[in-house]
């Protein structure tokens, strides 16, 4: 992998991690479409992947540091206060929503990616991701959801349902953030709140993936060239994810009636284009 390829992958990771368009799907399709000879299973690719996760994790933590301070500070605040009860409830909802994907991922993640990780399959799932985003918008309009329901008002059942939606992202091409936003919207959240809950959910999962990858490469010797790619990739992915997260939250705040639709259209068109190129 060249430095230019590393930077392009970092930019794509930073853009697609917060947006509901599947970061994993783009990571599979882009090298295939550009005919890059990359072996993502090579030992030297793991440090690069880990540092991309570190970059996006730091970016997301930077965007949502006030949320985490409110949650963690509230949990250890004055005993029995409303702020403490609300913080404990939100933290509990995040834990509940994370459990389904952790369990299913532990059992099936590698098998699903081995079976459905081909570029053509990913293109198909990217098209499906787009349709799911657009169908969710249509269903939400049919139900007349125009309220601004806070995260703390979700029931544990709502968190479980959002967590089940997240399991779809184990299929390459289906977006994790898109799936959880779909679940949040259908449980009564507005677009900005659904995105906020989705990206708060993402951070423990990205952290767990980073720790796992770091453990796997604990005995690895990393060359200077790979280290340069890793550091550059982390910085670029982090800055890109930071900007895109802020842009996305603002966009969702100002376009609550149809915010997922453009992403849905993009996924369908991108999937069709990628599938056509692969087949031809």
From Swiss-Prot:
Gene Ontology MF, one: undecaprenyl-diphosphatase activity
Q: How does it sit in the membrane?
A: Multi-pass membrane protein
Give yes or no: UniProt keyword Membrane.
Answer: yes
Keywords of this entry: Antibiotic resistance, Cell inner membrane, Cell membrane, Cell shape, Cell wall biogenesis/degradation, Hydrolase, Membrane, Peptidoglycan synthesis, Transmembrane, Transmembrane helix
Q: Where is this protein chiefly located?
A: membrane
Annotated compartments? Cell inner membrane
Task: Name the residues that span the membrane.
Answer: 1-21, 45-65, 90-110, 115-135, 151-171, 226-246, 260-280
Q: What's in the GO CC field? A: plasma membrane
Q: Which GO terms describe its biological process?
A: cell wall organization; peptidoglycan biosynthetic process; regulation of cell shape; response to antibiotic
- Which EC number(s) does UniProt give? 3.6.1.27
Q: Which reaction does it catalyse?
A: di-trans,octa-cis-undecaprenyl diphosphate + H2O = di-trans,octa-cis-undecaprenyl phosphate + phosphate + H(+)
The family note in this entry says:
Belongs to the UppP family.
Q: Any extra remark in the record?
A: Bacitracin is thought to be involved in the inhibition of peptidoglycan synthesis by sequestering undecaprenyl diphosphate, thereby reducing the pool of lipid carrier available.
Q: What does this protein do?
A: Catalyzes the dephosphorylation of undecaprenyl diphosphate (UPP). Confers resistance to bacitracin.
Protein name, entry field: Undecaprenyl-diphosphatase
What is the organism of origin for this protein? Answer: Gluconobacter oxydans (strain 621H) (Gluconobacter suboxydans)
Q: Which gene encodes it?
A: uppP
